[in-house]
Amino acid sequence: MTEFPGSDGDQIAYEVTGLTATAEEVVAAPPELVWDLVADVTRMGGWSPECIHSAWLGEPGRARPGARFIGRNRFPDGFEYEVTCVVTEADRPRAFAWVVLDDTGDPARPSSSWRYRIDPLPDGGSRVGQRFTHGPGFSYLREVAAKAPGQAAGIIAARRDGLRANMSAALRAMKAAAETAQATGVGPG
């Protein structure tokens, strides 16, 4: 793990840890169908501008606490990296969450945490909220910000804004898939 000694590194770690981004969509499909989509991590690469591939490790398709999957991400600058994720919550049809492991592999000290919350609506649809929380573990954002401490605030803000935009785009794509499945009666698979 890279350490950032001194006040600049400490400040960067403080500013990155707890960084949060959220997005939300109303979907004209029931929570069960929406949950089945968000819990199928293999579909994320088709929806997200950043995540280009994900696959279950071990038993495929088992969205349950403790299950692991890999995610491959690509940033606008072309940098690609692969992460290992651990499912922390699989409460159909209400919530699905996971942590992204840093290089220590400790789920209690993740690089980031992701969570979908799915609320039923009176009309039979769903409100889907997605939340990203950074840290406290190591990440590429920490590394980039530490290399340019004078620009760290801007780098961190740009990442937060990029996350929000990417999360919104992914939710819109998932919404389209859910609403198509609901309208046609064909399952989300």
Positions of PLM-derived features:
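Active-site phosphate/pyrophosphate- and oxyanion-stabilizing loops and adjacent acidic/basic residues
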Residues: 42, 85, 116
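Beta-strand/loop substructures that line and gate deep hydrophobic ligand-binding cavities in soluble
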Residues: 101-162
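Intrinsic-disorder/low-complexity, polar/charged segments enriched in Ser/Thr/Lys/Arg/Asp/Glu/Gln
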Residues: 18-26, 31, 68, 82, ...
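Well-ordered beta-strand positions
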Residues: 26, 88-89, 119-120
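Conserved long hydrophobic alpha-helices within structured protein cores
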Residues: 1-2, 86-95, 126-137
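Glycine-rich portal/gate segments that line the openings of hydrophobic small-molecule binding cavities
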Residues: 56-113, 165-188
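Hydrophobic ligand-binding cavity/cleft-lining segments
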Residues: 1-65, 189
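A generic "alpha-helical surface" signal
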Residues: 25, 161-165
